[in-house]
C-alpha cells in the first residue's frame, strides 16, 4: 500500500537495535501498512543499509525517517523528514533541512519526501533531549502546533511523539478534531492491543516501535487490533 494516507498501522525499526531474521519476517509479513527505519542515536549509513537490504526481501513499503544526513541512502520508497516544532533549537526546525537541500537538492525526488511536523511530549526521552524540545506544554499549545502544521506550513504529517511513554488519548482526540488535511501520526508506548485500538480511534496512523524488541507477540497483536 503506497498511499500513505491509507496507512493505519506502521512498525518502526531502529537500525541500531538487533532483530533476528525470523522476527523481521514476522514484522514485514504481519499486515502492517509500512515499516519505518529510524532512530535517535548511532544511526549510521552502514546499519541503515543493512536493515534496508533485509527488509527489501519483503513487499512491505519501507520508509527512512531521516535523523542525520550521513545515513541517507537511495532505495527506500519514501523519506520522512522530521521538523521538531517544539524544539528550542532552530536547527531542528529549519537549519538541518536547509543543509540537506543545499547538498542534495538537485538530485532529490520530491515525490518521495514527506515532511513531518513533530511535537515531542515525553521530556525524558532521547529525542526530546537531543532536540531540546519544550515538553512542558498545555493541551492548547499542542493544538496550536497542529494548526500551525496544517494551515501555516501545509505539512502532510503531524506526529505526536511520546517516545516510549503511553500518551493521553484525550489530547490525541483533540488534535484530530482540528486537523482536516494533515495526517495525524501517534507514536509512543503502545504495547497492547487495547492501547493500539484506543489510539487508533483518534490518530490516522499509529506507530509501534519499542515493544518489537521487548515482546514480538505483543507487537504483532497490535496490527490486528487496528485493522479489525
From Swiss-Prot:
GO terms for MF: heptaprenylglyceryl phosphate synthase activity; magnesium ion binding
Coiled coil spans: none
Stated family: Belongs to the GGGP/HepGP synthase family. Group I subfamily.
Keywords: Lipid biosynthesis, Lipid metabolism, Magnesium, Metal-binding, Phospholipid biosynthesis, Phospholipid metabolism, Transferase
Name assigned to this protein: Heptaprenylglyceryl phosphate synthase
Gene: pcrB
Source species of the chain: Geobacillus sp. (strain WCH70)
Amino acids binding Mg(2+): 14, 40
InterPro entries, sorted: GGGP/HepGP_synthase_I, GGGP/HepGP_synthase_sf, GGGP_HepGP_synthase
Cross-referenced Pfam families: PcrB
Amino acid at each position: 500500500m503506497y498511499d500513505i494516507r491509507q496507512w493505519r498501522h506502521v512498525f518502526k525499526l531502529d537500525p541500531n537495535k538487533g532483530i533476528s531474521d525470523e522476527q523481521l519476517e514476522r514484522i514485514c509479513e504481519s499486515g502492517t501498512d509500512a515499516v519505518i527505519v529510524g532512530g535517535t542515536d548511532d544511526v549510521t549509513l552502514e546499519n541503515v543499509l543493512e536493515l534496508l537490504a533485509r527488509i527489501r526481501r519483503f513487499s512491505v513499503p519501507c520508509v527512512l525517517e531521516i535523523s542525520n544526513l550521513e545515513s541517507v541512502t537511495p532505495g527506500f520508497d519514501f523519506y520522512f523528514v522530521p521538523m521538531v516544532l517544539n524544539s528550542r533549537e532552530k536547527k531542528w526546525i529549519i537549519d538541518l533541512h536547509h543543509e540537506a537541500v543545499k547538498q542534495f537538492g538537485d538530485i532529490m525526488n520530491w515525490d518521495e519526501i514527506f515532511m513531518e511536523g513533530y511535537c515531542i511530549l515525553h521530556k525524558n526521552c532521547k529525542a526530546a533531549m537531543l532536540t531540546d524540545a519544550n515538553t512542558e506544554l498545555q493541551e492548547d499549545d499542542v493544538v496550536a502546533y497542529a494548526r500551525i502544521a496544517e494551515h501555516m506550513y501545509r505539512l502532510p504529517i503531524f506526529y505526536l511523539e511520546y517516545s516510549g511513554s503511553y500518551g493521553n488519548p484525550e489530547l490525541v482526540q483533540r488534535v484530530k478534531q482540528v486537523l482536516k488535511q494533515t495526517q495525524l501520526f501517534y507514536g509512543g508506548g503502545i504495547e497492547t492491543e487495547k492501547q493500539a485500538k484506543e489510539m487508533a480511534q483518534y490518530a490516522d496512523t499509529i506507530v509501534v516501535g519499542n515493544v518489537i524488541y521487548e515482546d514480538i507477540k505483543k507487537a504483532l497483536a497490535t496490527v490486528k487490533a487496528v485493522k479489525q
